[in-house]
Amino acid sequence: MKNTLYERLQALPITDLAPVFDNGARGRTMSASSCNWLLSKVCEAGVKTIIDLRTADHTDKFCKKVHDAGLAYRHIAIDSKNTDVREIIASLPDFFAWLDEGDFYMACAMGLHRTDIAISIYYVFHPSVPYDSVPELRGHRKQGSLRCDDIARRLNSIMNALTPEDLIRLGLPDGYRDEFNRRKKHLFAINSIF
């Protein structure tokens, strides 16, 4: 399916811009003061929500700039190992809803690494994402191969920490580990071909 939001954003000078499924985009955080005009253009292009994945470098200043540009601001700390896994799990229902709404721009400091992890979490743990809707991972490619250790570490940490109550909250069945392994394997297999 065509991602018209991504197509409209391609006209703008956004570093590391990439599509997210058929309803969003991702790239670098536009937090520098020189990017204020760009946030307004992103809004004009149809983005309604900025999803900030930064952890320690997250600031309220960027939140204000986003609101001043007429956009909604959402934050979830995502990384490969430092953010507490329970914090991430608690945020997943909201995070999945933000992506389901569409018209979002997901951002991290460098544009691709944390967003790779985030869209992998969405693909592997959100029950409404079809098995064949594998996201393209762009930030973890190095010298002709996919470097999946950071992504696998975070996916495994979430799976290992899920309680029966978490599974219910996320709409996942008991015994989800088999489907988790199937999706994780498929994610890495598809992305190893580029």
Locations of the language-model features?
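Cys-dependent protein tyrosine phosphatase-like superfamily
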Residues: M1-M106, M110, I117-F194
